[in-house]
Design a protein with these regions (language model features):
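N-terminal, active-site-proximal structural segment of metallo-dependent hydrolase catalytic domains
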Residues: 1-96, 104-114, 187-195, 282
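Metal-dependent phosphoester-hydrolase catalytic domains
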Residues: 2-19, 198-208, 213-282
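Beta-strand-turn-beta hairpins that frame and shape the catalytic cleft
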Residues: 20-32, 116-120, 124-129, 146, ...
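Active-site beta-strand/loop signature of hydrolases that rely on acidic residues for catalysis
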Residues: 29-36, 57-83, 123, 160, ...
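Active-site environment of divalent metal-dependent phosphoester hydrolases
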Residues: 39-41, 76-80, 110-112, 178-182, ...
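Short, electropositive alpha-helical surface patch
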Residues: 83-101, 121-124, 222-234
Length: 282
């Protein structure tokens, strides 16, 4: 009898009488920028021979719980620049991070590739569409590696769009040529940067660009992108263990506001992790 009476009272209540917790709409989103160095960790004593530990990479991505994850050097270059049709590291990342949608791309296959990292990925908790890729030619600057003269391979820009907080967001990811590693008379890959800026000019809505820009004198990079309407979330903290350079950036345009950011060292790579939280500007 008591149960029936309680049920009657509940049915007679209007919606205003019932205190129901309504989930608040998401108003901000988090971005993680990470050159994962194909899963090779960091060893202070012997960094060049540190073991590959993809489990540590996966743990870092999970720990930051970002809405958007931008990754560089996802795979390790194979002999003669070979590119497996099914990229093993990316495949494992997707299996372990099932909450994310993803887009992965290699740059153009090239037998001149050096035995480092290759491949870009965008991971997003919301579906991706409008995917693109654009090659970034490298100048034919001759340099020597392990006693062999060679020239650098081209680089890559990828992009995709998604809906976050009910708004459309355009996302780009890149990894530029490290001129400073070539000991060339030119210090920065200005030509590659200009192609990226050309691509950014085609977007009209909220846009962000992350990546490893490999610019040792980063203030020139920051100034160049600022003149085009893109700010970096930070330009003061070093993001690379091997040299005191600010190589990694997240740039954003005037339709986004950066609320906070962090540079966090990790044993999962020779690069630090850069995160930033954003909101859309009405």
């Amino acid at each position: 009898m008591y149960i029936e009476k309680a049920a009657e009272n509940l049915l007679e209540q209007t919606p205003a009488d019932i205190d129901v917790a309504v989930p608040r709409a998401k108003t901000t989103f988090k971005v993680m920028q990470f050159n994962m160095q194909f899963g090779q960790g960091w060893d202070d004593r012997d960094p060049d021979h540190a073991p590959v530990n993809l489990d540590l990479t996966i743990a870092e991505i999970r720990a930051h719980n970002a809405d958007i994850v931008l990754l560089q050097e996802v795979e390790q270059v194979r002999a003669r620049g070979g590119q497996p049709w099914t990229p093993p590291n990316y495949t494992r990342l997707r299996a372990a991070l099932s909450a994310y949608h993803g887009y992965f791309a290699y740059r153009a296959a090239d037998a001149r590739e050096l035995p480092f990292g290759i491949g870009l990925a965008i991971l997003s908790k919301t579906p991706l569409r409008g995917r693109m890729r654009r090659g970034l030619p490298s100048p034919p600057i001759e340099f020597e590696f392990n006693g062999v003269k060679t020239t650098p391979t081209d680089r890559l820009l990828i992009g995709a769009s998604t809906l976050l907080c009910g708004r459309e967001l355009r996302i780009y990811n890149t990894h530029l040529l490290a001129f400073f590693m070539l000991k060339a008379q030119y210090d920065e890959p200005a030509g590659q940067r200009e192609i990226i800026l050309e691509e950014l000019c085609t977007t009209q809505g909220a846009t962000l660009l992350g990546g490893d820009f490999n610019v040792s004198k980063h203030l020139s990079l920051v100034s160049q992108f600022d003149a085009a309407g893109y700010q970096t979330v930070q330009e003061n903290e070093v993001t690379w263990r091997r040299r005191p350079y600010v190589l990694d950036h997240i740039f954003y345009n005037g339709q986004l506001r950066a609320l906070r950011h962090a540079v966090q060292p990790t044993r999962a790579s020779d690069h630090h992790i850069l995160t930033a939280e954003f909101e859309f500007i009405d």
